[in-house]
């Protein structure tokens, strides 16, 4: 098993050095397709933080910011050690991404949907799951129903839930994953935790990752 693990580079190193290259977008697209739950096509890698240069650097954080074919902004962040006010920093990063990608004079229609995926290798708090999703919905104080927003697009009334407009946050607690990987999502988390890729994997992106 150790021999198998050694075949594959860490995903954080791949994000830092390899997945920013267009030829390797398939790996990142596969990862995002599995985690977001819809086909993702990356068209651009946006300016992002991180400055480590060696694969064995003991770095604390690496991130990548991308734009998909719908214009959505996707932030993938790997955090190796605990950080004070971590969620506050995630919120700041999302707010910054929103404001950076709307120009003065644009209408609010140009505000982009943002996905923030945090891959965490430290204990953020208590919880029985290894993935937590945060979305914004408006629930009736008295009726408990969910508000659906009506907007006009090309002379057509389109109804959206607030979750389609507001940012989506995903917290992946890698160290809490203790299952036999069966689904594509489980295979990806198993790889993030153990560096193992099943030779028969059908998970989008993982087969490409094995050959990056």
Describe the residue ranges of each PLM region:
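Elongated, amphipathic alpha-helical interaction scaffolds
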Residues: 1-212
């Amino acid at each position: 098993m150790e021999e198998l693990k050694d075949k594959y580079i860490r995903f954080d190193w791949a994000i830092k050095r390899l997945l920013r290259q267009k030829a390797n977008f398939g790996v990142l697209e596969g990862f995002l397709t599995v985690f977001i739950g819809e086909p993702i096509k990356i068209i651009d890698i946006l300016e992002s933080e991180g400055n480590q240069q060696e694969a064995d650097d003991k770095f604390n954080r690496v991130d990548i910011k991308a734009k998909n074919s719908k214009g959505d902004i996707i932030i993938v962040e790997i955090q190796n050690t605990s950080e004070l006010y971590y969620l506050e920093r995630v919120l700041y990063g999302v707010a910054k991404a929103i404001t950076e990608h709307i120009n003065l004079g644009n209408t609010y229609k140009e505000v982009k949907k943002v996905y923030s995926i945090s891959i965490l290798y430290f204990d953020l708090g208590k919880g029985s799951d290894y993935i937590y999703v945060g979305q914004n919905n408006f629930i009736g104080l008295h009726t408990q129903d969910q508000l659906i927003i009506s907007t006009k697009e090309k002379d057509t009334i389109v109804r959206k839930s607030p979750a389609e407009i507001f940012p989506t946050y995903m917290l992946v607690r890698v160290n809490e994953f203790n299952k036999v990987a069966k689904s594509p999502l489980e295979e990806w988390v198993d790889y993030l935790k153990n560096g193992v890729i099943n030779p028969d994997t059908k998970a989008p992106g993982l087969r490409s990752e094995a050959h990056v």
